[in-house]
Design a protein with these regions (language model features):
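Nucleic-acid 5′ end/cap handling module spanning
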Residues: 138, 161, 174-177
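Short, conserved phosphate-binding/catalytic loop or strand-edge motifs used
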Residues: 162-172
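Catalytic palm subdomain of template-directed nucleic-acid polymerases
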Residues: 171-183
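Short beta-strand
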Residues: 51-53, 117, 158-164, 205-209
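Long, well-ordered alpha-helical scaffolding segments within enzyme catalytic domains
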Residues: 31, 137-156, 183-198
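Flexible loop/turn segments at secondary-structure boundaries
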Residues: 17, 57-60, 70, 135, ...
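C-terminal accessory nucleic-acid interaction domains of nucleic acid-metabolism proteins
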Residues: 1-22, 29, 40, 44-45, ...
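SsDNA-processing nucleotidyl-transfer enzymes
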Residues: 1-4, 34-126, 130-133, 137, ...
């Protein structure tokens, strides 16, 4: 297969990776090839962790930090110091690399919140809103709206996306000098403030037994050693859903109506949304904002 002048060896296109829907490896590769123009800017320069599903979503998966040694010579890497020593991470700089990653059955792509050249400086503050049953994504929408209101009081813009799984994620772009030593305490303080304001609906503590019927505002992802699923990444669910940027009007509608059926997007729907709206997450890449004092 030739992708923008790069030659790739592609195999097992008919292999079913999502057994409930029959979605194949070939369709995964096609999705990533088509979404690449929009997705690659969100991956470019960032150390990338792959979550690979060689036998599909119903079978075992594994996370791969170290870029495979059998990679094509045109796949770029970045060496990053970690608790395990230096690791050469893949960098997804172009469509060909994204297609190669898909060929590895890396359904989920988890980039760093910072680019490799400025690894100590996250470009965003990220909040992962995770519902504890019977709470659901509607409850996440309501918490996301509270986050937006809180940030607006600080003069900050934020952007929402589905996780592609059970919840929502809210990103506050920074693209400046902030370090993780600032963003993580800030995120924790915001989560605790929301919990204080709505103790029956929000929890900020890590203990899972505290989450029943509440939305866990996970602030802990704001860490140099952690990653968050990329916007437009597929997820390993029963259907090939993807982490999808949302209009705030969609979040508001779900919070008001009590139903979030319209906030679940499979691969084809994501491509249609890009055709209609463009990249709703584009401002996250460039908007420069400063952290306020809490």
């Amino acid at each position: 297969m030739n992708v923008e002048g790069r030659t790739l060896s592609i195999s097992n296109l008919g292999k079913v990776l999502y057994p409930d829907t029959g979605f194949t490896k070939g369709e995964v590769i096609d999705y990533y090839a088509r979404v690449a123009e929009t997705m690659v800017p969100h991956l470019s320069g960032r150390p990338l962790t792959l979550r690979r599903f060689p036998n599909g979503v119903a079978e075992k998966s594994f996370f791969e930090k170290r870029c495979p040694s059998h990679r094509p010579d045109w796949v770029e890497t970045a060496s990053v110091e970690t608790s395990e020593g230096p690791i050469d991470f893949c960098l997804c700089q172009d469509r060909a690399t994204l297609v190669w990653v898909a060929q590895l059955a890396a359904l989920e792509l988890h980039p760093s919140l910072s680019i490799a050249k400025r690894i100590d400086h996250p470009t965003v503050v990220a909040f992962d809103l995770d519902p504890g049953p019977p709470a659901d994504v509607v409850d996440c929408c309501r918490v996301a709206l509270r986050l937006r209101e809180l940030f607006a009081n600080f003069g900050l813009e934020c952007f929402a996306k589905t996780s592609g799984s059970k919840g929502l994620q809210v990103y506050v772009p920074l693209n400046g000098k902030a370090r993780y030593e600032q963003t993580k305490p800030f995120a924790h303080a915001v989560a605790k403030l929301l919990e204080k304001q709505s103790p029956d609906e929000v929890v900020s503590k890590m203990k899972k037994e505290l989450r029943k019927g509440k939305v866990f505002v996970d602030w802990s992802q704001n860490d140099r050693a952690k990653t968050t699923v990329s916007v437009y990444s597929l997820r390993a669910r029963e259907q090939p859903t993807a982490s999808t940027p949302l209009l705030w009007a969609e979040v508001e509608a779900a919070g008001e109506s009590g139903t979030a059926e319209d906030l679940r997007f499979e691969a084809g729907a994501v491509l249609e949304r890009i055709s209609e709206h463009g990249d709703l997450f584009a401002p996250v890449l460039e908007l420069e904002q400063d952290l306020p004092d809490l």
